[in-house]
UniProtKB/Swiss-Prot annotation:
Protein name, UniProt field: Uncharacterized zinc finger protein 70
InterPro entries per the UniProt record, alphabetical: Znf_C2H2_sf, Znf_C2H2_type
SUPFAM superfamilies: beta-beta-alpha zinc fingers
One GO molecular-function entry: zinc ion binding
Length: 70
């Protein structure tokens, strides 16, 4: 997955940001937490930030943040 594929990621943030949020409905990627929360409010009020997947902007891989309970 190329970094160029992210249409809504601005180039000045690309160098600073390591992780982004991916919307579970439309697949758009946001760097800032606040912009992702605003996007989720417009889509569906039942969605929470914890439903979003984190994605590495450098490699394009999904990052698992939640810790597993044993």
């Amino acid at each position: 997955m190329d970094l160029i594929a992210f249409k809504n990621v601005k180039s000045k943030f690309l160098l600073m940001a390591l992780l982004g949020y991916e919307c579970p409905i439309c697949g758009e990627i946001y760097i800032k937490r606040k912009s992702m929360i605003t996007h989720l409010r417009k889509h569906n009020t039942n969605l929470k930030l914890s439903n979003c997947r984190r994605i590495s902007l450098r490699t394009g891989e999904y990052i698992e943040i939640k810790t597993e309970e044993e």
